[in-house]
C-alpha cells in the first residue's frame, strides 16, 4: 500500500467491482457466527470490531485519528468499537465531544505517542502551555479504552501531558500512562472517570485536574521523590 493511502478507498474512492468495507464485514460476520455455532467453545473468543487501525495497511485506517473521524457524530443507540493493532502511533489524538459511545481496544503493544511540552512553541511562536502539550484529548462521553498506552516522550522538560481527559463516564481498563511531569490530566470539572488495572507513572504531581476520578487496582509509580497528585 502506498504511503498516505487508505486500503478501504483505493485512489480515494471505493471500488464497486469488489466488496466495500460494509460488505466485507457482513461476510466476515456470517462466517465467524457460523464457526461459533459449530464450535461453541470458540464463541467466547469472538469480538466484533467496526473499524481496525493498522500501520501495515491490513486494517481500515493507518491512524487512530482517521478511525475516530469516521465514527458518525452522536451515535446514541449503539457503541462503535475500534481495534488498534500493535504499533507506536505518533499522532496527537483528539476525540471530540460528538464521537460518543466509542470503545477503543488495543492489541498488546498499541501505543499512542507524541512529544509536545508546555514550553514548546506553536506556529505563532507562543508556548503551547500545559493543556496544549497533551498527546491525546478525550472529550466524548461514555468513552471506553482497553489495553492502550498513552505516552508523552518529551522527557523531563516541565509540564508534558500524556492524556487529557474531559469526558464524562470515561472508563480506562488495563491502560498505561507514561510521562514525567503532569502525565494524566483529569481535566473535566464535574465529570466522572474510572481507571481499572492501569499503570500511571511520572515525577511531579503527575495525576491532576478537576474530575472525580476513581483508581481501582492501579499501579501508580513515582519515578523520583515528589508529589503524586495535585487536586484542584
Model-derived segments and their meaning:
Residues 1-46:
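Catalytic His-Asp segment of secreted/periplasmic serine-dependent ester chemistry enzymes
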Amino acid at each position: 500500500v502506498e504511503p498516505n493511502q487508505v486500503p478501504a478507498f483505493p485512489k480515494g474512492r471505493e471500488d464497486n467491482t469488489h466488496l466495500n468495507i460494509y460488505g466485507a464485514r457482513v461476510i466476515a460476520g456470517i462466517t465467524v457466527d457460523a464457526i461459533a455455532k459449530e464450535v461453541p467453545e470458540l464463541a467466547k473468543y469472538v469480538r466484533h470490531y467496526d473499524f481496525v487501525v493498522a500501520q501495515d495497511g491490513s486494517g481500515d485506517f493507518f491512524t487512530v485519528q482517521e478511525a475516530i473521524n469516521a465514527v458518525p457524530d452522536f451515535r446514541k443507540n449503539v457503541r462503535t468499537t475500534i481495534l488498534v493493532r500493535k504499533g507506536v502511533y505518533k499522532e496527537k489524538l483528539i476525540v471530540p465531544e460528538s464521537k460518543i459511545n466509542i470503545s477503543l481496544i488495543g492489541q498488546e503493544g498499541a501505543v499512542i505517542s507524541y512529544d509536545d511540552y508546555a514550553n514548546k512553541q506553536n506556529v505563532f511562536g507562543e508556548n503551547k502551555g500545559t493543556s496544549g502539550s497533551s498527546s491525546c484529548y478525550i472529550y466524548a462521553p461514555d468513552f471506553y479504552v482497553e489495553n492502550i498506552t498513552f505516552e508523552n516522550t518529551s522527557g523531563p522538560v516541565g509540564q508534558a501531558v500524556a492524556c487529557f481527559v474531559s469526558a464524562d463516564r470515561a472508563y480506562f481498563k488495563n491502560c498505561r500512562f507514561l510521562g514525567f511531569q503532569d502525565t494524566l490530566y483529569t481535566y473535566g470539572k464535574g465529570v466522572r472517570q474510572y481507571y481499572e488495572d492501569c499503570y500511571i507513572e511520572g515525577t511531579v504531581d503527575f495525576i491532576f485536574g478537576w474530575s472525580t476520578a476513581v483508581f481501582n487496582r492501579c499501579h501508580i509509580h513515582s519515578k523520583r521523590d515528589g508529589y503524586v497528585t495535585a487536586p484542584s
